[in-house]
């Protein structure tokens, strides 16, 4: 089996440590870089001979942002780099939008400890990886009767930040878009989800996440 050079990006040092220790148990995986923000990650990517990036979905960074914005930038400027997203966000609408970016895998931080090694093993075979926990979440989209959940990546990014507590004005600044654009994308997403106000939106975002009984 060919060796796989991996970069890890997460803004929590203890998470970086845990991932590295987990990957050290896989003899064909080499960790060649660890970064705590997207700016440091992007600045160092050209210097590293990496095959795979394991990155958090929500991570600080000034110029390059995080989430879908960061993933799209990396895929555009580093097309040969495979991407596995590691996230605490288990909202199916957002996970669906992330998968639409044609990444190689997505792993929930609260999922099974074996999911990340399985994702890398699948990647070695030229396959993508979606754990059962994520597949079950995506099934809730059709089973829950919440309307058309096919959010665009931009709509998904706005909802992710809104769910994290950011105001529309703050989201506009963070994503370098106008307040009018952010408001329009938020309204469009709400129409797709069939919710009429912010309270209903927050209730939806919390109601279609992973319940304890659903976990691996």
UniProtKB/Swiss-Prot annotation:
It comes from the Bacteria. Phosphorylated and activated by RcsD. GO terms for cellular component: cytosol; transcription regulator complex. Residues 5-124 form the Response regulatory domain. Changing residue 56 to N: Decreases heterodimer formation with RcsA. Does not affect heterodimer formation with BglJ. Residues 168-187 bind DNA. SMART domains: HTH_LUXR, REC. Coiled coil: none annotated. Induction: Expression is dependent on the alternate sigma factor, RpoN. Repressed by hydroxyurea. InterPro entries: CheY-like_superfamily (IPR011006), RcsB (IPR030864), Sig_transdc_resp-reg_C-effctor (IPR016032), Sig_transdc_resp-reg_receiver (IPR001789), Tscrpt_reg_LuxR_C (IPR000792), WalR-like (IPR039420), WH-like_DNA-bd_sf (IPR036388). The modification 4-aspartylphosphate is found at residue 56. GO terms for molecular function: DNA binding; DNA-binding transcription activator activity; DNA-binding transcription repressor activity; identical protein binding. Keywords: Activator, Capsule biogenesis/degradation, DNA-binding, Phosphoprotein, Transcription, Transcription regulation, Two-component regulatory system. Transmembrane segments: none annotated. Activity is modulated by phosphorylation and interaction with other transcriptional regulators. Probably up-regulated by YmgA/AriR, and possibly down-regulated by YcgZ, all 3 are connector proteins providing additional signal input into the signaling system. GO terms for biological process: cellular stress response to acidic pH; DNA-templated transcription; negative regulation of DNA-templated transcription; phosphorelay signal transduction system; positive regulation of cell projection organization; positive regulation of DNA-templated transcription; regulation of bacterial-type flagellum-dependent cell motility; regulation of capsule organization. Residues 144-209 form the HTH luxR-type domain. It holds the Pfam family Response_reg. The keyword Phosphoprotein applies. Component of the Rcs signaling system, which controls transcription of numerous genes. RcsB is the response regulator that binds to regulatory DNA regions. Can function both in an RcsA-dependent or RcsA-independent manner. The system regulates expression of numerous genes, including genes involved in colanic acid capsule synthesis, biofilm formation, cell division and outer membrane proteins synthesis. Also involved, with GadE, in control of glutamate-dependent acid resistance, and, with BglJ, in derepression of the cryptic bgl operon. There is a close linkage between the Rcs and PhoQ/P signaling systems, and both signaling systems respond to certain external divalent cations (zinc and magnesium). Belongs to the RcsB family. Interacts with RcsD and RcsA. Homodimer. Can form an heterodimer with the coactivator RcsA, which binds to the RcsAB boxes to promote transcription of RcsA-dependent genes. Can also form a heterodimer with GadE to bind to the GAD box, and with BglJ to bind to the bgl promoter. This is Transcriptional regulatory protein RcsB. The gene is rcsB.
């Amino acid at each position: 089996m060919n060796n796989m050079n991996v970069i890890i990006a997460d803004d929590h040092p203890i998470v970086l440590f845990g991932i590295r220790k987990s990957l050290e148990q896989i003899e064909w995986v080499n960790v060649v870089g660890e970064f705590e923000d997207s700016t440091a990650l992007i600045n160092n990517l050209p210097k590293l001979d990496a095959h795979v990036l394991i990155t958090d979905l929500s991570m600080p960074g000034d110029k390059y942002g995080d989430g879908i914005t960061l993933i799209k930038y990396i895929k555009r400027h580093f097309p040969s780099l495979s991407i596995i997203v590691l996230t605490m966000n288990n909202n199916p609408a957002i996970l669906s939008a992330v998968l639409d970016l044609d990444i190689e895998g997505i792993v929930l931080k609260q999922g099974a400890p074996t999911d990340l090694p399985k994702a890398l093993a699948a990647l070695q075979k030229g396959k993508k990886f979606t754990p059962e926990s994520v597949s079950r979440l995506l099934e809730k989209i059709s089973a829950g009767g919440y309307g058309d959940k096919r959010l665009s990546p931009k709509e998904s990014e706005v909802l992710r930040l809104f769910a994290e507590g950011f105001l529309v004005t703050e989201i506009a600044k963070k994503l370098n878009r106008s307040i009018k654009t952010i408001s329009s994308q938020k309204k469009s997403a709400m129409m797709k989800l069939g919710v009429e106000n912010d309270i209903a939106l927050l209730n939806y975002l919390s109601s279609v996440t992973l319940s304890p009984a659903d976990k691996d």
